[in-house]
């Protein structure tokens, strides 16, 4: 049964293949530019994550505001009805 299931990523390179890819990268870009490329790639990933978090926060605020507004209006209505009951009982 499990022999027929194909892996999610069938062509991921292993140890020797990664060494060949690393050698090609060094030959293409040179050893001096690799740290700069790694640094800029890390910064790009960080900016992408910050942007994603900002969008997630905005979406939560948008969906959360509706729920909070409903809860606030309900609690306001409860306090108004409680105040009116206490005022009527004082008279």
From Swiss-Prot:
Tagged with keyword Membrane: yes
Gene Ontology cellular component terms for the protein in this record: cytoplasm; TAT protein transport complex
Molecular functions per Gene Ontology: protein transmembrane transporter activity
InterPro entries the record matches: TatA/B/E, TatA/E
Region annotated Disordered, chain positions: 48-91
Subcellular location per the Swiss-Prot or TrEMBL entry: Cell membrane; Cytoplasm
Bilayer topology: Single-pass membrane protein
Pfam families recorded: TatA_B_E (PF02416)
Residue stretches spanning the membrane: 9-29
Example GO BP: protein transport by the Tat complex
Biased composition (Acidic residues): 54-72
Signal peptide: none
Primary localisation category: membrane
Keyword set, alphabetical order: Cell membrane, Cytoplasm, Membrane, Protein transport, Translocation, Transmembrane, Transmembrane helix, Transport
Biased composition (Low complexity): 73-91
NCBIfam families found in the cross-reference section: tatAE (TIGR01411)
Its biological purpose: Part of the twin-arginine translocation (Tat) system that transports large folded proteins containing a characteristic twin-arginine motif in their signal peptide across membranes. TatA could form the protein-conducting channel of the Tat system.
More info: H.volcanii possesses two TatA translocases: TatAo and TatAt. Each may interact with specific Tat substrates.
Family that this chain belongs to: Belongs to the TatA/E family.
Subunit annotation: Forms a complex with TatC. Cytoplasmic and membrane-bound TatA form high-molecular-weight complexes.
Stated name of the protein: Sec-independent protein translocase protein TatAt
Organism of derivation: Haloferax volcanii (strain ATCC 29605 / DSM 3757 / JCM 8879 / NBRC 14742 / NCIMB 2012 / VKM B-1768 / DS2) (Halobacterium volcanii)
């Amino acid at each position: 049964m499990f022999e027929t299931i194909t892996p999610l990523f069938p062509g991921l390179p292993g140890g020797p293949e990664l060494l060949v890819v690393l050698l090609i990268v060094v030959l293409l870009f040179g050893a001096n530019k690799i740290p700069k490329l790694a640094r800029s790639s890390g910064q790009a990933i960080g900016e992408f994550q910050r942007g994603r978090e900002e969008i997630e926060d905005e979406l939560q605020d948008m969906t959360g505001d509706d729920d909070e507004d409903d809860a606030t209006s309900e609690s306001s209505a409860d306090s108004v009805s409680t105040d009116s009951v206490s005022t009527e009982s004082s008279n």
